[in-house]
Regions:
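Glycine- and acidic-residue-biased ligand/ion/polar-headgroup-sensing regions
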Residues: 49-51, 58-86
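Conserved hydrophobic/aromatic beta-strand scaffold that supports enzyme active sites
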Residues: 45, 53-55, 75, 97-99, ...
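Short hydrophobic/aromatic patch on the recognition helix
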Residues: 247, 251, 299-300, 304
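Short, conserved glycine- and acidic-residue-centered signature motifs
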Residues: 68, 212, 264
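Alpha-helical DNA-recognition elements
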Residues: 253-254, 265, 306-307
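A short glycine-rich, His/Asp/Glu-containing loop-to-beta-strand
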Residues: 19-22, 38-60
């Protein structure tokens, strides 16, 4: 059985421009300081076979140029910048996303109090995302890079997720020594980045809308076609063929609610339909609640009242009819 090594961890405290520039020169990156002062910050990186995550924070404006490795896509999210910052001449600020193809040149001005989280994803692992993003696929994209800003909806949450992940990697040793945990984090952040990128590019946003609608329709079909009204979230994922994160995003994009809320509302509607249809059959509210997966009668009544503005017993008796 092959030996599994823990993730490679690198945490460098930036104390001056000379030492940091010397460190980066080994990675074919040139930097220079644009304003007087003492450069401070940190450069943290965790690397596993599935990719790497880097977090760079600096206090002074820098000019930086270099070339990314040829075997990986680089996905970067700016999480903070308090003065003008550029990437390939395009202005970037908190919430800006830039994606570089393998081996691409990067050329930027990084402003005061600049913070960026970068994900390196091996080409073979990133391939699965390219069909969903034709505008960045090599051979179809006009450039080897793309710079956009995440849409206002969800931008703050995206920044916080990336910052939170970076803080965890830097400060939680128990987490970062777990290969499985780090690889899972890379996969989650990559999916978040790709979704944000698609939403920010008009042509990709329309594609995301179509994909989301298709997932929701598939989920609805799974519920309608089966007699199993207590379908769980994991079963819905299997029925639609997508992960929980993708399922959640599709439902929020199309319906404005998460899949768990949708399932609950679906079961409440089915319960209401049964209460109306079974009025003359002697079926009790408890029997209907249990049939549709509500095992706590008090909670069922409360949720039902909130949903329909009346108690289930009122629906069953038909006393609400004019």
């Amino acid at each position: 059985m092959p030996q599994v090594f823990p993730p490679e961890f690198f945490d460098y405290e930036i104390k001056d421009i000379d030492a940091y520039a010397g460190l980066l020169s080994d990675a074919r990156v040139e930097i220079s300081q644009l304003l007087p002062g003492r450069l401070r910050g940190h450069h943290t990186r965790v690397r596993v076979p599935a990719g790497e995550i880097s977090w760079i924070k600096t206090n002074l404006p820098l000019r930086g140029r270099g070339q990314f490795p040829s075997g990986a896509w680089m996905l970067s999210l700016v999480t903070r910048a308090s003065s003008l910052s550029l990437q390939h001449g395009a202005e970037v600020r908190a919430g800006s996303l830039f994606v570089h193809q393998p081996g691409a040149i990067h050329d930027g001005i990084y402003g005061r109090n600049f913070s960026v989280v970068c994900i390196g994803v091996p080409s073979h692992r990133f391939e699965r995302y390219l069909d969903r993003m034709p505008s960045v696929r090599p051979g179809r994209a006009r450039r080897t890079w793309r710079v956009v800003r995440a849409s206002a909806v969800g931008r703050t949450d995206l920044i916080e997720r990336f910052n939170g992940a970076a803080r965890t990697l830097r400060h939680d040793e128990a987490f970062r020594v777990s290969m499985t945990a780090v690889e899972s984090m890379i996969d989650d952040l990559t999916a978040d980045f790709v979704n944000a990128l698609r939403d920010a590019i008009p042509s990709e946003a329309q594609s995301a809308l179509r994909d989301g609608a298709a997932i929701v329709r598939c989920a609805e079909a799974a519920l309608i076609s089966g007699s199993e009204h207590t379908l769980q979230l994991d079963e819905l994922c299997r029925a639609t063929g997508v992960a929980k994160r993708s399922l959640s995003r599709a439902f929020r994009l199309i319906l404005g609610i998460g899949p768990a809320t949708y399932l609950r509302h679906y079961r409440l509607n089915e319960a209401r339909r049964a209460l109306v249809q079974d009025r003359n059959r002697g079926t009790t509210v408890t029997e209907v609640a249990l049939r549709f997966g509500f095992h706590h009668l008090g909670r069922f009544s409360e949720q039902y009242q909130t949903m329909f503005g009346e108690a289930p017993s009122v629906t069953r008796s038909g006393s609400n009819r004019v």
